[in-house]
Amino acid sequence: MVTCRSLLVVIGLAVLTGCSGVSNGPNGGSPPAEPTPDTISGTVTFNGQPLAGVTVTDFMTNTNTVYQTAVTDAHGKYTFTGMKVTGNVPGDYQVYVNKSGYGFYPSVGNGAQARRFDYTGQFLNTGGLPPSGIFFNVIDYLALPDSPLTGANFAAYDGTNAPVTLAATGQQVSYAAGDDASVHKGAAWSAATRFTDNQNGTVTDSLTGLVWLQDAGCLGSALWAAGLTAANQLASGACGLSDGSTAGQWRMPNVGELESLVDVSASNPALPASAPFQNVSGGVYWTSTSYYGGVSGSSAAWTIRLSDGRYMNDTSSNLKATASNVLWAVKGAGGGTIKLQATGFYVPYAAGDDGNLQAGVPLIFPRFVDHGDGTLTDTVTGLIWLKQADCIHGQWPDALAAVNSLASGQCGLSDGSSAGQWRMPNRNELQSLADRAQTNLAEYFDYTYRNKDNSVFQSPIFTNYIETQYYWTSTTDAADPTEAWTVYSCDFGVYDIAKTSAGYTLAVR
């Protein structure tokens, strides 16, 4: 697969002013006035308050050079001046921010949109292009005559104001000290009260706020493209619906949305037993999230087997053109107890797919704050992770015990933590690290990204995140308690393997 170098952008496209119609020939008339150089201005805030001392970079993509830099003042404000049109070519300027200890997400008040965008130029260095994509938040502005950009703002995050709260997995039975059910991390929910039958062919999930088609088998099986179309065209009057919905309101769920239904305490199907769904198959269900394949397209999409909640990764289950999988439909944009994070996928391959809709809380950049003591904070979820990713390795029971006894002085830690404060991540926690625009997350986590002058732009996030390896979660496979759920280090798919197998583990608190 093709790796990508991408970033999240807000594109501000100004409109050219009208011509004056004045003659510029020898018979008279005034020559056109030189266009006023454009300006870019905005504010950086943290929890709604101005954040001073943030370095703001104005990068010109036409020349792949830093055009100018600024530092936010006591009011969190910055201004750039002098953006011009050169000849008939508008200057393309990308603004991004950095301050140690924070991640950022952009917004702009003039109608521009936040979205991810392919970008390679800044990371051309003596080693060539990075092996994996890097995604960071910028405001992209085309400098057209007399069109200043205002309200080019950034919100800062440090983990204490994390926008995402993870849900509990639903595991009820404990199989070992320190496992998922014994620790019970995540937003609690009750299967008996979580779902509401709306008596109109829909079911509302109060945990996520999503509204699901009650008849999970009505749309049947289809190839991926046909499934997307069927979901997009679903409307009241079909599949038992009397909700007044119209075509375009329903969609195929992305991988995070479908995963949110999985109850790891159940099997056949792996859904809460009291959920009022009908005709749920134990087979393989499509998601609208593709494997990243570059801007030209991808031949495969993520699928989940609902008999047990396993992600599928084989040609018979994932190829869009040949695999016939079951389709479910969802609508709504949240409003529940928790907010689901976006998958990170951003390339639109088809109408209604994940790349088009990008549903969920967007990912922040830089996402992780390195505390210099062997720990990292994820600004999206607020979780604190062990930085050294290869320190704990073994069978599931031994890995659990090692994490339970982990303390400062071990595995590169100098944080003052003591035994009992760390835990093995559950299925939802480990999976939350995923960014579905990456084809090899372990590679991305380990890589040093350098600017053209070979200076470091981003140091490795984790230390020695091992490629092509299974990383344990504390969550047991309810369909076979001799197995536990793992997350594969490259694709971040969720797979069950025997607890007697050897695997790596991260630690979290």
Short names for language-model regions:
Residues 1-8:
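Bacterial N-terminal signal peptides that target proteins for export
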Residues 15-18:
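C-terminal motif of bacterial Sec signal peptides marking the signal peptidase cleavage site
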Residues 20-30, 133-251, 255-423, 427-509:
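Glycine-aromatic-enriched surface loops/turns that form tight recognition elements
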Residues 20-39, 45-49:
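Beta-strand-rich domain onsets/edges
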Residues 28-31, 111-143:
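Extracellular beta-sheet/turn segments enriched in Thr/Pro/Gly and aliphatic residues
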Residues 38-40, 46-63, 73:
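Short, ordered, surface-exposed loop/turn motifs in non-cytosolic proteins
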Residues 62-83:
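Short, acidic Ser/Thr/Gly-rich low-complexity loop/linker segments typical of extracellular
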Residues 88-123:
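A short, solvent-exposed loop/turn motif at the edges and junctions
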